[in-house]
């Protein structure tokens, strides 16, 4: 017979008694997720977080969360061209019960990418790292496909290696010129209608006709130091008055009055 303490009897409790089940959602709060002012739909959803308890602050648990939203939902549009483009927004600050987000990247859905790849054509891709005027380092990926000439009797529309290199150079030059002279707000406004890809398609017509040209992905590699005023301005809440301040005239020997108590 083994000698030892019977833990069940020493505690004086009955074996098999169930513990009181506490619903974990009673310790959580809902917060509204706000998109920047570049998008039509400002409130994109809600998120849960544990309430502030001791040293664990609720707002710190929210910062850094990434939300992936379809462009069709952000623009409140049922257009099919917007539904396959996803924008990533990262939570940077919490004001009351509102989570303020900023642009964190863009991507195409997998089904859209797979549907574009077909036989008898050349796939051309390019990527480049570009820094915006406000200090964001972005890695931009572009994709395009050669288009068959309607007058041609050939089944295929393959581009030569020299033409592929020229088209790739055009892609890099157009992306660099469009983003390097703009801040993040202007870049996002260009990504929403995909105007950069349309400019690339027009610029490459003289080399080889293209179709299905898209900015496939945008990654945010580096960000400038966080400033709350710039984030509030991005959300349309930090704009000051346009009126200049009034100049106050004081005599040269002016001294402030001495306060009796501090």
From Swiss-Prot:
It comes from the Eukaryota. The keyword Ribosomal protein applies. GO terms for biological process: translation. GO terms for cellular component: cytosolic small ribosomal subunit. Keywords: Cytoplasm, Ribonucleoprotein, Ribosomal protein. GO terms for molecular function: structural constituent of ribosome. Residues 235-253 have a biased composition (Basic and acidic residues). Its main location: cytoplasm. It is found in: Cytoplasm. It holds the Pfam family Ribosomal_S3Ae. Belongs to the eukaryotic ribosomal protein eS1 family. Residues 235-262 are annotated as: Disordered. Component of the small ribosomal subunit. Mature ribosomes consist of a small (40S) and a large (60S) subunit. The 40S subunit contains about 33 different proteins and 1 molecule of RNA (18S). The 60S subunit contains about 49 different proteins and 3 molecules of RNA (28S, 5.8S and 5S). This is Small ribosomal subunit protein eS1. The keyword Ribonucleoprotein applies.
């Amino acid at each position: 017979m083994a000698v030892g303490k019977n833990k069940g009897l020493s505690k004086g409790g009955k074996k098999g008694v169930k513990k009181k089940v506490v619903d974990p959602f009673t310790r959580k709060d809902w917060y509204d997720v706000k998109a920047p002012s570049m998008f039509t739909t400002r409130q994109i959803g809600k998120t849960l977080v544990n309430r502030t308890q001791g040293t664990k602050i609720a707002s710190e648990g929210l910062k850094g969360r990434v939300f992936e939203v379809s462009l069709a939902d952000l623009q409140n549009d049922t257009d099919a061209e917007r539904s396959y483009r996803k924008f990533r927004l990262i939570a940077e600050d919490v004001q009351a019960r509102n989570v303020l987000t900023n642009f964190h990247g863009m991507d195409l859905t997998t089904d859209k990418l797979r549907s574009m790849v077909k036989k008898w054509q050349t796939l051309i891709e390019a990527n480049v790292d570009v820094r915006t005027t406000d200090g964001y380092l972005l890695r931009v990926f572009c994709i395009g496909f050669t288009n068959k000439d309607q007058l041609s009797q050939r089944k295929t529309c393959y581009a030569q290696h020299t033409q592929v290199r020229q088209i790739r150079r055009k892609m890099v030059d157009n992306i660099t010129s469009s983003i390097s002279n703009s801040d993040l707000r202007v870049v996002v406004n260009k990504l929403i209608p995909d105007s950069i890809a349309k400019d690339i398609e027009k610029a490459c017509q003289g080399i080889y006709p293209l179709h299905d040209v898209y900015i496939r992905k945008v990654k945010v590699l580096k960000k400038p130091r966080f400033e709350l005023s710039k984030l509030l301005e991005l959300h349309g809440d930090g704009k000051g008055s346009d009126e200049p301040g009034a100049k106050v005239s004081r005599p040269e020997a002016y001294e402030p009055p001495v306060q009796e108590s501090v």
